[in-house]
Amino acid sequence: MEKTACLIVDVQQSVVSALPDGGEELTEKLSRLITWCRQQMVPLVYIRHDDGEDRISEIDSRIKPKESEIVMDKSYPSAFLETDLESWCSEQGITQLIVAGMMTEFCIDATIKSAFERGYQVLVPQGCCATVDNEYLTAQQTEEFFEKRIWQGRYAQIFSLESLLSQPVKK
C-alpha cells in the first residue's frame, strides 16, 4: 500500500513573478492541489531554494504553508541532495510522491529523477509545474517535452490535475 506526500518545489515569489501571468495560473492549480492534499491528509512539504538572499526564499503568498506543514531549504536542484527529505519520507513511511512547482527543466526534473532513483513512485499533475521561456523553447514546449518525452513511463506517471483530484489517495 502506497503512502503519499506532496512536494511543492521552489514556488517562491521572485521565481513565480517571472511567469508571464505573474504565476496566476500556476498558483490557482497549486491551490487546488494543496486543498485536496489537506482534505485527504496527504502531508505537504514545501521546498525552498536558498541561495542566501532573503527575498528569493519567500514562498509565494498565494500558496503559503500552514504552520503545521513542513518547509525544507535546499541549495541544489534536487530536493533530496543535502536535505532531510529522504529521512523524513522514510520516517513517515512515504512511498509515493506528488511533485509540483517551479522550474520544470531544473529543480522539478532533478527532484523527480532523484525520487525515482530512491525507489519512490512519482506522480506529476499536468499544469502544476512551470518554467519560463528560454532561447530554445517556450515554457509550454519545455513543460510538454518533459511531461511527455522525459518523465512519462520512465520516471513518473503524468495525470491531469482533474483526474488526480477526483481520486482518493491510499493512506
PLM feature spans:
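N-terminal nucleotide-binding beta1-loop-alpha1 segment
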Residues: 5-11
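Active-site loop/turn elements of alpha/beta-hydrolase fold enzymes
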Residues: 11, 49, 127
